């Protein structure tokens, strides 16, 4: 299957931050509502942590956006990362082939 590849993979944390801005809610307030440390939430927003099922359920409760949506975003992020990594490997292999072809003149 030939899937269109994004330029970068978008972590669900980006969308959590968008929701915070839209709702004029601080990270501290969201962390308090979720019952998590602010540092945990900050790492989630920065893409250093994955959205798991427990986190997705908390986000669903607070933002009224389905847990399935949050899990889908995480899944898509991971797939995009893997595809981008594979594409990079293919490009490096291709570049190496061209380099060695150029030295065999």
Each model region followed by its residue ranges:
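Short juxta-domain linker segments that transition from a proline/glycine-rich
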Residues: 10, 21, 78-105
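Short, basic-rich loop-to-helix N-cap that marks the start of a DNA-contacting helix
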Residues: 48-62
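Short alpha-helical DNA-recognition segment
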Residues: 25-43
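Short C-terminal boundary/hinge segments that cap the last helix of small helical domains
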Residues: 65-83
């Amino acid at each position: 299957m030939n899937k269109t590849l994004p330029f970068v993979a978008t972590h669900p944390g980006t969308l959590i931050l968008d929701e915070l801005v839209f709702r004029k809610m601080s990270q501290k307030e969201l962390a308090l509502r979720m019952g998590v440390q602010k540092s945990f939430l900050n790492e989630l927003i920065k893409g250093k942590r994955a959205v798991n099922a427990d986190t997705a359920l908390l986000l669903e409760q607070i933002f009224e956006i389905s847990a399935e949506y949050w899990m889908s975003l995480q899944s898509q992020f991971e797939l995009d990362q893997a595809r981008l990594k594979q594409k990079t490997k293919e490009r490096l292999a291709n570049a190496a082939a061209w380099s060695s072809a150029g030295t065999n003149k």
